[in-house]
Amino acid sequence: METAAKTNKRDIQDGPPKEVKLPISEALLDYHCQIKENALEQFMARIKKLREKNQKYHERNKRLKDEQIWHIRNLLKELSEEKSEGSVVVTREEVENAMKEKWKFERDQEQNLKDMRIQISNAEKLFLEKLSEKEYWEEYKNVGSEQHGKLITSLQNDINRVKENAEKMSEQYKITLEDARKRIIRETLLQLDQKKEWATENALRFIDKGSYREIWENDWLKKEIANHRKEVEELENAIHELEEENLVLIDQLFNCRLVDLKIPRRLYLTQAVGQEVPPEVPLELSETHKVIPEKSDSQPVDIKSRDVSSISFGSSGFRLSHKDSRFGQLLKIDEEASSSIEFGASDMKYLLYEDEQDFKDYVNLGPLEVKLMTVESKKMPIHFQEKETPVKFYEDVRSPESHITYKMMKSFL
């Protein structure tokens, strides 16, 4: 019916001749109206179909309900018959208890469902929070991390720069502190020395003449002790060298062949030295032993064994080789104390420093009688080299060299 009415309306609207042209606004309105009418017709047709389907579904549901009721009744009848045959009769209290338990179970199930829904909602909220946090951190990773990284690097550079500056400043402060400490110590020491000198100068004004002379003599004695120690050290070194030379000479004496020992005394005196033949005197060891202890400290022994001049020349040259005169005096005293040792040393020197040219005629002499040698002693004076010691009186104290200084006073403390 409605469709027929709509078709009639369309026919009526389409009635005017086509030659009449409507304005653009009316044409647009007609076009929109036609679109709305077409959509309305489609919706009406769809609603009609849905109503028919709904009616069919209602009928089917009604039929299924009737069948369900019939089946339930049959089942109930069968159950009642089975229960009546061999089941226990259930009382009302049992039914009520069973219903209460069932209701309680259902309420528990409903509560569990509510709890599960609450947990699900909480989990969804937490998931949404984590998701939003994840999105935030992803955005931070993509955008903010670079900015923060640049900021962190700049801050680290600033921190390192500040540390370097602090270390440099601390080193500079340490250097300045050390310099100031050294300067203060140096100035304090200088001031202490200056004050001590002033104190000594002030003290020297009140020193009596006796104490002044004692101080000066003590300083002079210290200088003399230092010089004496130096001389003793030089003498020890010289003695050590002489001992080494003596050992070398003894070694040479024992290793060389002394052929001239076989030459008789008469031949040596007549041919080598050119002296007259002395009268023969028997060699007595007792006399020689008597002569040696009779010599005093001031009388050396002169030994005439082969060449007195060569022996004296060798011994004098040996003594003159030393620079120190005191050392020569000590050698003279040693010669006086041990004449027998001096005899052996002089003879050794003669044998070492002999001249072989004096024995040219030794080959043409022929066999001669071997004579024993004799030892003669002669008293000779000893001349000591006196060292003049400077004698200073009390009047010399006023000289500038004898001025008492702070170092001299400090040595007494």
Curated annotation (Swiss-Prot):
The keyword Coiled coil applies. Residues 32-186, 215-255 form a coiled coil. Keywords: Coiled coil. The keyword NAD does not apply. This is Coiled-coil domain-containing protein 83. It comes from Bos taurus (Bovine). The lineage of its organism: Eukaryota, Metazoa, Chordata, Craniata, Vertebrata. The gene is CCDC83.
